Amino acid sequence: MNTITVVDARMGRGKSSAAIRYMNRYKDSKRFLYITPYLDEVGRICERCDFDQPDSDHMSKSTELKLHMRLGHNIAATHSLFYLMDTEALELVRQKHYSLIVDESIQVIERLNITNKDFDLIINQLATEHDDGRIEWLDDSYTGRFYDYKEMANTGSLFRLDSALLNILNPELLRSFDEVFMLTYLFDGQYQKAYLDFFGFDYNIIGVEQDESGYRFSDRPDAPPPLDYRELIRIVDDPKLNAVGDKHYALSKAWYDRRGYDNPEIRKLRNGLKKFFQSIPDGSSETRLWSCFKSDVNKLVDSRTGRFRNNFLQTSARATNQYKSRTDIAYMVNRFADPNIMKFFAKQNVTIDSEHFAKNFII
């Protein structure tokens, strides 16, 4: 089994630039699959490294990905396409000896939102469960409303844990590559680390260095020069504005789920958001940004005026410089690891650094 290289370095340290340098150096002797969350980054990699991307109008992207692999092309693609790689694609990865570079953390595990009735239907009629909890679909020709679940089952990623269904990245997706690089930050607070530990992957943690030719991967953990953020960040430590978040589980997903638009605490939070933005001298729509769970945005937007709706950014946003001009930030979230997911990892005594887990989302 290959050893995974984790490039753990903060934003702006040159991780993707180092990856581009590495791929351009070895692209004639190695074959690469570079995956990233965003299509514009796929285009940038194709331009900088002369890679191909699945973009045909005449076939599915997963089919085109396998076509490029059969031809031995270097490829850039999105995370979402990577998740759809099936056994045929993995066999091509092994045959052609591909290397994988993962830009930003991949979603290695998630709890699926499903009703009890639908859960029972899948478990009792549409699929069978293996001893390890893996779900296998019974009817390969099925095209009904649970087709997405069938696709997960076909890639070996659909699991049952008690009364929950989990989508867990098939570890063969990583094991099949000759080498794997993961470009990330705060690795020890991620599901990604817990996943590697759970499935017994060996990994090395390195950083990035700069020389006369640009950025390159180092052979040791990242050691950036210290930065003094005190002149760059002003925290508005107003007891009245922040009191709604004083309790340990305040602003968590479960906290929001138990409160509707007219709840006194939600109303207080909504008014606090308004007061915060109005208190910023010279603040405008171009400088404001606020975040909460996507499912709860309507609770914090005034139903009458709709004010600040256009300043919203969901907490799952990653790897973008699109909002670098925003200077007035309200982060209305308290992140905790999903207890069902932690129960799954606990079967192998795997834990996550809770402080770094929460910090991962805000950074």
Predicted regions mapped to residue ranges:
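Conserved interdomain hinge at the start of the Helicase C-terminal
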Residues: V6-A9, S17-Y26, P171-L173, I233-T287
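Conserved Walker A/P-loop ATP-binding site and its immediately adjacent core
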Residues: M11, S16-Q53, S80-L81
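Conserved RecA-like ASCE P-loop NTPase motor core of nucleic-acid helicases/translocases
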Residues: K30-Y38, V180-T184, E286-K294
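Conserved motor-coupling elements within RecA-like helicase/translocase cores
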Residues: K61-I75
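Short basic/glycine-enriched coil/helix segment immediately N-terminal to the Walker B
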Residues: M69-G72, D86-Y98, R175, S284, ...
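Conserved RecA-like P-loop NTPase helicase motor core
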Residues: S80-D86, T305-I363
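SF2 helicase catalytic motif II
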Residues: S80-F82, L90-S157
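Interdomain hinge/linker at the junction between the two RecA-like core domains of SF2 helicases
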Residues: Q190-Y191, L196-D262, G272
